[in-house]
Amino acid sequence: RAGYAGVQRSAAVWTGDNHSWWEHIDLLSTMLMSLGLSGVAFCGGDVGGFQLNAAPELYARWIAAASLTPFFRAHSALDTRDHEPWSFGTDVLEIARRYVGLRYRLMPYLYTLFSEAARTGAPVMRPLVWEFPRDPRVQNRSDSFLIGPSLLVAPVSRAGVQERSVYLPAGVWYDVWTGERTVSGDPARPENGGRIVACDAPVDRIPLF
């Protein structure tokens, strides 16, 4: 949570003592994108929050989002609930297993992105404007992020949600879970923007394209 010039060369950085609040899932995305743009590519936050006690639904949503960030770990303060995946019951454990498995399947892609970050300084976790600079609708958007150029992640940061809206910039997108193909806007005219789509988002599924 503290650093100095050159810290990105030798260490991972985390966001500091976050809390088990839904708002801190939103802050996770914003802070990590900012760190990436500042040259700190290997960054993350404590899954479930460091302070207070995470509820099962909050933990499930958090681990889904955090599994797709550069630095991924669960951690908590001494006087709070344990934040290991098996501490929240079998349903949450299965969700955690799903996203840990997804991260392992993405390891070759992540390795490539970290290699690029080491060589060029490009962030691993990117705001949409990094890849779509001509789209005016993504200039201040932080409710979703990219992992490299090819994976759009839209975390759920509200309790009880079963669906969320996701903005897809101009292009052809595929839902990772269903394979459904969506053509958003005109790929030849990205300055005209894409469109917002409604995505199913039960507790075990993070919108992912």
Show which residues each predicted segment covers:
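Catalytic-domain carbohydrate-binding cleft regions of carbohydrate-active enzymes
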Residues: 1-207
